[in-house]
Each structure stands twice: as C-alpha cells, then as structure tokens.
C-alpha cells in the first residue's frame, strides 16, 4: 500500500488563504453500504433500538474524534418533515447537547452542525441523518458572517416565507444557490445551547414546515444542504453572534441542477437563474 494514501494534514493556499484538508483515507470510504443500512436498528452503527442517536464517524474528515454522525430516527424511509415537531425537537436537543459537549474541548474552536440530503449533494446513505464537524479553528465563512454583525432581515417583504413563534424563514436577497432559505430567531441567541424550550419548539416547527414545502416544490424529495451558523467556542468575544440556519439546493428546476461553473469559481461572483422573490412566493403558496 502506498503510504501517501494515509496522508492527512491541513494546508493553506499562500496567496488566497484557502484552507484545504488533505484526507487520503477518505478515498477508501464506501460510496454505498454493501449490505443493509448501517443506521437501521440492528445495523453496524445501531445495534439497539433508538429514537435519536450519535456516534463517531468511521471515516472522519478530521482527526481527534472531531467528526460525528447524528441519526434523526430509526425509520429508514422517514423525512425530517415526517418526524413531526416532537421528533424534530428530539433532534434539536441532541444537536444542542453535542454542541455544548464538543464546544468545551480545548481543541475545538467551532462546531458545525450540518446535513447533506440526497446523492446529488454527496449523501451516500439514504437513512435520515446529519453530521457534526468540530474544527480546531474558526473557519473563514462563519467567522466573517458572525463577526460582521449579521442579523436576520427584519423586513424581508416579498422574500418572506414562513414564521413559527419567535423564528422566521425568508429567501436571502443575494442567494448563490437557486434555492436558498435563511432561518433565524427574531431575538438574538448566540448558539443552540442558549436556545430555550420555547425557541427549540419554534425551530422544530419551522424546520418541519419549510423542509416540507421544499419537498412539495417539485413534487419529489429535494436534495439540499443545511447547516447552522453559531457562536464559535474559541474563547473569544463574539458579542454579535446570532444563531441562524441556512438551507440551499442546487436544483433550479425539478431534477435539474445548476452547476457553479468556471466564471463563478474563478471570480467568486455568481449568476443565479432563480429570482429570490419568486421562489419565496412559490414557497408561501405551498404552506
């Protein structure tokens, strides 16, 4: 075996500052399970019955037990929407518990909670699940966003989609993906650990609502990427950090992906064929 295949390190482009994690071992990661679903009860990762569950990733992108998998339900055919508010609340509570636990580690400066749903965005197992990466630094994008005083749009107007209690969802005005949603509490909360009982219920209801609308948009399960932006755990001062959720999909129409191509990659300027206000109108009508 070539020893280079086990290479794992972090490199930074000297001119652009881009951080690249070189993880040779992930080339050996199976694209699809060879026998049965490892996340179903009795499978490799879930020998006992469960409602929600987390475990360390067998194919981590980073060393030091800083990559985890979160199972939303034992039901293989479920969706986040079919969990209902009670099931979604269980997931949120587990997300919050893992954020608080990982965030106390000296080698963790930022906890990213995320989901890739569908093979179109890289999911290799269909069972409902998400992941957590615990970074030993604050990555550039959330650092810039949270450090710049980001706040939810107080008056999104035609870009408004839905609201539940103290949480609301709207389409961002300058979305880089054809489908994009921003979810946030109306009053500042820095991270999931600070979100109170009512706030967690409102977030659960809003996630169940908007993810259901997204699946109804094209009358089929929508591939999406979802992630939380929240206070870094590096011990620094983040007085303006405001918890928020982003959901994006590459589909510009049913089954048709919009590819981020050469001009956009080269210049980091984007061309979105979907008008945010029209997307918001469609999603409102699906409520």
Which role does the model predict for each range below?
Residues 1-127, 133-192, 198, 211-212, ...:
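Active-site microenvironments that recognize anionic phosphate/pyrophosphate groups
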Residues 200-206:
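Gly/Ser/Thr-rich active-site loops/lids in small-molecule metabolic enzymes
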Residues 206-219:
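Extended C-terminal subregions enriched in glycine
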């Amino acid at each position: 075996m070539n020893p280079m295949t086990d290479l794992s390190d972090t490199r930074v482009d000297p001119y652009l500052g881009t951080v690249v994690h070189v993880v040779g071992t992930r080339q050996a990661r199976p694209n699809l399970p060879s026998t049965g679903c490892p996340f179903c009860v009795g499978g490799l990762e879930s020998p006992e019955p469960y409602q929600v569950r987390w475990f360390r990733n067998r194919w981590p992108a980073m060393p030091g037990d800083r990559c985890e998998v979160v199972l939303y339900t034992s039901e293989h055919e479920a969706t986040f929407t079919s969990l209902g508010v009670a099931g979604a609340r269980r997931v949120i509570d587990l997300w919050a518990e893992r954020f608080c636990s990982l965030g106390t580690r000296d080698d963790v400066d930022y906890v990213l909670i995320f989901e890739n749903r569908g093979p179109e965005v890289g999911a290799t197992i269909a069972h409902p699940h998400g992941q957590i990466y615990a970074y030993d630094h604050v990555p550039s994008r959330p650092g810039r966003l949270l450090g710049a005083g980001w706040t939810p749009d107080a008056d999104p107007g035609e870009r408004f989609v839905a609201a539940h209690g103290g949480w609301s969802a709207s389409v961002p005005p300058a979305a880089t993906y054809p489908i994009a949603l921003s979810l946030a509490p109306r009053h500042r909360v820095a991270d999931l650990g600070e979100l109170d009982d009512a706030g967690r219920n409102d977030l659960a209801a809003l996630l169940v609502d908007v993810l259901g609308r997204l699946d109804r948009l094209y009358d089929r399960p929508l591939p999406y990427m979802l992630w939380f932006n929240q206070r870094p755990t590096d011990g620094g001062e983040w007085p303006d950090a405001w918890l928020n959720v982003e959901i994006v999909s590459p589909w510009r129409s049913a089954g048709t992906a919009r590819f981020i191509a050469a001009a956009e990659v080269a210049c980091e300027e984007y061309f979105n064929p979907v008008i945010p206000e029209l997307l918001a109108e469609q999603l409102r009508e699906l409520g």
